[in-house]
Amino acid sequence: METYKTILFTSNLSENSRYAFTHVTLMARSFGSKIILLHVIDEIPGQLQYRISKLYGEARWKEMLDSHMKEAKRALTGKVSSKKMIQVALKGFCDEEGLSIAEGGVAGHEVIIKEGDVAKTILEQSALNHCDLIVMGASKGLLNGTAVGNNIKSVLKGAKVPVIVVPPAPVG
């Protein structure tokens, strides 16, 4: 039977990610694996940035971006940076599962936060960290089904290792 030494878990910090993480910890405990928790902050596509900056002007666009970031930080975390807030949320995932380094049969865990294209960053981090498995959580579809978005499709297409997509938690 194949064993997974390093599992890359991708999270968007949603309830679906939290549910998927419970399965990741079960696998990690079964295999004695290390878990890498990855959160990618999606970038605004360059072409869209260009169009908006031309519409409003470069200075106004930068001002809008700065204002948006400040408001988002204030709304979500007060004075805590967005990266710190994400680290706290990911640590909360670990705490809920009773996961700490070298505890409970898990070889360890690491939290990585990156900015960029989500699928590309997941594939890059999988290779850089020599991951044997990628685990992603699907989201709930519009009509109570499971939605597999473009990021999951791109990772499935480009992955060099197995990818597990965990459906959303059953309702009820």
What is the predicted role of each segment?
Residues Q47-Y50, L123-E124, T146-A147:
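Short, well-ordered secondary-structure micro-motifs
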